[in-house]
């Protein structure tokens, strides 16, 4: 009876955790499609992207190192794990593009999560047309992931 008359202050936290769970589910789907969900840095990516989605106003001016420093004592190692995992996603995406240029995953992510020119450069490297690998911008990758996770709801 007491619960009926007391104001429910937990509703916002429940909806926030439901929103957070939805963002994490969307993020895990994307990382699975890229083939990097099992990589060590995928946990770091999930942590940072969830934070970016929950605090969009404070993240705009922060660097990736500053973001990483919020979650661990050694932000450089976290940033390196994220970089390696994101690069593995780039390589997996390039392989998909080589196999089937019209692959749904390739079409969806080659120009949104990564710079398409860099995906092409990685495809050329795999074909051994060049020795230069594709580059990636971690900030762009994380921001694009956050955007896709928020708008996939």
Predicted regions and their residues:
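Generic marker of "main functional regions" within proteins
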Residues: 41, 55, 59-62, 77, ...
């Amino acid at each position: 009876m007491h619960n009926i008359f007391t104001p429910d202050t937990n509703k916002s936290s429940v909806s926030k955790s439901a929103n957070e769970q939805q963002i994490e589910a969307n993020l895990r789907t994307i990382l699975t499609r890229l083939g990097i969900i099992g990589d060590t840095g995928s946990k770091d990516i999930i942590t940072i992207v969830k934070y970016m989605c929950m605090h969009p106003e404070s993240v705009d001016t922060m660097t990736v190192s500053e973001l990483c420093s919020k979650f661990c004592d050694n932000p450089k190692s976290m940033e390196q794990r994220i970089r390696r995992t994101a690069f593995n996603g780039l390589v997996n995406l390039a392989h998909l593009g080589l196999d089937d240029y019209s692959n749904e995953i390739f079409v969806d992510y080659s120009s949104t999560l990564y710079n398409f020119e860099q995906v092409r450069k990685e495809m050329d490297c795999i074909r051994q047309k060049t020795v230069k690998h594709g580059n990636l911008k971690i900030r762009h990758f994380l921001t694009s992931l956050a955007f896709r996770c928020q708008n996939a709801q």
